[in-house]
Amino acid sequence: MSNESNDLEKNISHLDPTGVDNAYIPPEQPETKHSRFNIDRDTLRNHFIAAVGEFCGTFMFLWCAYVICNVANHDVALTTEPEGSHPGQLIMIALGFGFSVMFSIWCFWWGFEPSRFSLFVFGQSHLTSQMCSDVVSSDHCWDGCWWCR
């Protein structure tokens, strides 16, 4: 009988004045996951950042190429025949697309390299000094780079 009274006292001690048992502590719930694909919040954020970066790079490339094409097609100095394009226009458009790709890659590789840009965002370095040091340093080169041999 004494064991039953001790158990009863333990059970009563867990009850608050309203009579609700507050001794049960539910296990921690995991972060919100989409059960079908098992995607958590960080994965969604990373995919969003990658999608925005891809959009910016693609938009910059296509916008620069579009501007070059408009300049080439509206050049007053060139007289074109209605059936075709002038070779100078074709060369300018081809070089425009090439320089557009080069400009986009240069902007996102040298200027917006994630590790150095995050150092700037968190106040650990100046962006200008990081960009200048990138031009001088060869820490971006890979093993097969002809520049670093």
From Swiss-Prot:
InterPro entries: Aquaporin-like. Residues 69-89 are extracellular. It comes from the Eukaryota. It is a multi-pass membrane protein. Residues 1-47, 111-149 are cytoplasmic. GO terms for molecular function: water channel activity. It is found in: Endoplasmic reticulum membrane; Cell membrane. Induction: During exponential phase in rich medium and repressed in minimum medium, hyper-osmolar medium or in sporulating conditions. Belongs to the MIP/aquaporin (TC 1.A.8) family. Aquaporins contain two tandem repeats each containing three membrane-spanning domains and a pore-forming loop with the signature motif Asn-Pro-Ala (NPA). Water channel required to facilitate the transport of water across membranes. Involved in freeze tolerance, osmotolerance and cell flocculation in liquid cultures. Is non-functional in most laboratory strains. This is Aquaporin-like protein 2. It comes from Saccharomyces cerevisiae (strain ATCC 204508 / S288c).
